[in-house]
Amino acid sequence: MTDIRITGIPKEAGFGDYVALLKPRVMSLVVFTALVGLLVAPVTVHPMIALTGILFIALGAGASGALNMWWDEDIDRVMKRTRNRPVPSGIVAPGEALGIGLALSGIAVVMLGLATNLFAAGLLAFTIFFYAVVYSMWLKRTTPQNIVIGGAAGAFPPMIGWAVATGGVSVESLFMFALIFMWTPPHFWSLALFMKSDYSDAGVPMLTVTHGRRVTRAHVLVYSLLLAPLAVAGAFTGIGGPLYLATALALNGWLLVGAVRIWRRDEAQAEADRYRVEKGFFRFSLYYLFLHFGAILAEAALKPYGLGGW
């Protein structure tokens, strides 16, 4: 029997490719923080409304991912980290990604408004617009402060979850927004330290590309120094408590140790161990955010038993 290999035929998009188009890893963080915002709000929400609200917030996050992948197809194709995504790899056509992103955006916003309230829907619509237009189409390609300002897009989900429950904004929801907003720069700059060539090849003006790794290391430290007291201060809001305080103190102590280590390293050290410290800091920063929000959720879960909060 002759083994015939056919090449040059594009792969047909499958279910998994369309799921990947929605950036499920990013969506998981959005869903979790939105869920925490919803569950810790000081009101009782019907389980069906809560489930529906989270579903359409997730759909809105997926829509943002699809729109971002449509717009960034040219630079995603160049970057090693992103070239295998459905659009740059040619599995999903850019026009198809755009259509899916727009359709899901409309469905998510309208249905969230009908199922919960107009304020939450308006906040979701603004978040999609901010991520797809303000960040993806403008900031990402024009300024090294792209992830500082653009980080607001990823910080809105807990505010949307809170708004689903309460119909408004509070000090607590603003704190959750601020926590993610201040976490975003050191998280992504630590990634940029060991992925500099990817951003440079694609022409993305990340801080490592425009100002170099030395300046970026200093920025990681400065933003970590700003983030740590903010995170600890959350213990003294209506969603904080002793468990959150202990968690925040431990995590932010570790954060500052890691940030100082990054700041003190020179390029010879980093290249010698293939950016081991920077990669470790990046991975830790993911756990950092999940554990902070997990502690917030735990405080709320313990309150009915007289154990959560102060």
Swiss-Prot record:
Which reaction is recorded as catalysed by this protein? heme b + (2E,6E)-farnesyl diphosphate + H2O = Fe(II)-heme o + diphosphate
InterPro entries recorded: Protohaem_IX_farnesylTrfase, UbiA_prenyltransferase, UbiA_prenylTrfase_CS, UbiA_sf
Pathway assignment reads: Porphyrin-containing compound metabolism; heme O biosynthesis; heme O from protoheme: step 1/1
| Superkingdom as given in the UniProt entry | Bacteria
- Give the family this protein belongs to, as stated in its UniProt record: Belongs to the UbiA prenyltransferase family. Protoheme IX farnesyltransferase subfamily.
Task: Add the further remark from the entry.
Answer: Carbon 2 of the heme B porphyrin ring is defined according to the Fischer nomenclature.
The protein's name in its UniProt record? Protoheme IX farnesyltransferase
Q: Which organism is it from?
A: Cereibacter sphaeroides (strain KD131 / KCTC 12085)
